[in-house]
Amino acid sequence: MKLRDLIGNDAAIEPAVAALEVTGVALDSRVVRPGDLFFALAGSKTDGARFIDAAVAAGAVAIVGDHAPDGCKVPFIAVANPRRALALAAARFFPAQPATIAAVTGTSGKTSVAAFTRQIWERLGHASASIGTIGLVSPKRTVYGSLTTPDPIALHRQMDEIAREGVTHLAFEASSHGLDQYRLDGVRVSAGGFTNLSRDHMDYHPTVAHYLAAKLRLFRELVPPGGAAVISADHDCSAEAIDAAKARGLRVMAVGRNGDGAGEGIRLTEVGVDGFSQKLTVEHRGKRYVVLLPLAGEFQVENALVSAGLAIGTGSDAANVFASLEHLEGAKGRLERVGERNGAPIFVDYAHKPDALAKALQALRPYAKRRLVVVFGAGGDRDAGKRPIMGEIAAENADGVIITDDNPRSEQPEAIRAAILATAKGAREIGDRAAAIRAAIEELEQGDALLIAGKGHETGQIVGSEVLPFSDHEAVAAALASRVA
């Protein structure tokens, strides 16, 4: 592929340079191959310009960045926004994409919405996939990942591969980092979804306003005019999200208790608990639908309605979509029931931020006739301000609290636990996560419910720079097995 075809009109390039043959794109000098175009991106910890010599030594034919270094031995293309240039180049190098693409953003619920939207489409007969925190799920493969939104090269490579495999519908998570860093530019988004906004990533975003602005890039810049914007209407930031979508000329579909049931949106008029399911009554275009949603927690109602809106907004029949909701399966590690002891259910959930922890505990309160117990911690090298908030939430919403470790990274685990314990009055401290889970399970009695929060689907515990094998699911299974033995 000619270099001019990858860069497009993003920069003025000399004819001889524009005619260079490029055989790949890279942003990591360690994976550069002969013929690659290397993008030198400035990051929060290091500057890609430091690795230009290594990229050239590995065979890079040209470099793209925002400033040319002294003595560069290959052509350097200066662009105003190297991150966006990378995303667009990746889209041109890997051109195939599913015909229908829905992207969802928000603090919580992205993984579930992407999974639910994929499941709805599958049930309606479409070859569907989802990409996000738990990786890539498609008809032909499941590839586990760790980033909510992959880097542009990985994202466009995956889309190109699944499109060539016959996938026509894709739902993916659009994180604030991914949106702010232009990783999603070049994706032909058909519809965008917005779930909610609460405190998260304050180690990255300087203010909540900056955080929201990053989220709203989905509507302001990526979904094309005329595309659908499915927005949960029950939050303080909903009006701003709706205004952003309207200003772009999008078809706004407001969903939830304050949704537009008479028009294109979905209005939730009634919800009731039915065992571990919920009976919903909703309105869409003035018509009433009753749905038995096989998921616990009202936050899952919000996720299901955003998913339904994305499916309807991309052309699926409303009646068939609402019927499909009755067959949804929760995403791995999202308020997932993983066992029981003495009749007390045990749940694993990814909740690792204040609002998500509160919602998970509130969702499980109806199932705890006696005691609701929670085991959780907080990640190291991340927003430290949320730790006392989460401690207070746990103390207010649970009857028993055990504070443990959750990816301490380079921080001292004891210090992280202490920050949570400062506000979690009456909580116990068991640093070893497996031991904490085992202790909580051993004490369960009839009428209790246990929430193990923070890791969800994860299969590792990050200590220092090492990722040690660890799974909440496996820890629960081991604890239950030890009681049987």
UniProtKB/Swiss-Prot annotation:
Cofactor: Mg(2+)
Annotated positions of the N6-carboxylysine modification: K215
Residue window of motif Meso-diaminopimelate recognition motif: 406-409
Keywords: ATP-binding, Cell cycle, Cell division, Cell shape, Cell wall biogenesis/degradation, Cytoplasm, Ligase, Magnesium, Nucleotide-binding, Peptidoglycan synthesis
Pathway: Cell wall biogenesis; peptidoglycan biosynthesis
The family this protein is said to belong to: Belongs to the MurCDEF family. MurE subfamily.
Binding site for UDP-N-acetyl-alpha-D-muramoyl-L-alanyl-D-glutamate: L27, S29, T148, T149, S175, Q181, R183
Binding site for meso-2,6-diaminopimelate: R382, D406, N407, P408, R409, G454, E458
GO CC terms in record: cytoplasm
Reactions catalysed: UDP-N-acetyl-alpha-D-muramoyl-L-alanyl-D-glutamate + meso-2,6-diaminopimelate + ATP = UDP-N-acetyl-alpha-D-muramoyl-L-alanyl-gamma-D-glutamyl-meso-2,6-diaminopimelate + ADP + phosphate + H(+)
Class in the EC hierarchy, top level: ligase
Alphabetical list of Pfam families matching this protein: Mur_ligase, Mur_ligase_C, Mur_ligase_M
Biological process, per Gene Ontology: cell division; cell wall organization; peptidoglycan biosynthetic process; regulation of cell shape
SUPFAM superfamilies: MurD-like peptide ligases, catalytic domain, MurD-like peptide ligases, peptide-binding domain, MurE/MurF N-terminal domain
Official protein name in the record: UDP-N-acetylmuramoyl-L-alanyl-D-glutamate--2,6-diaminopimelate ligase
EC number: 6.3.2.13
A Gene Ontology molecular function term of the record: UDP-N-acetylmuramoylalanyl-D-glutamate-2,6-diaminopimelate ligase activity
Entry PTM: Carboxylation is probably crucial for Mg(2+) binding and, consequently, for the gamma-phosphate positioning of ATP.
UniProt binding sites for ATP: G106, T107, S108, G109, K110, T111, S112
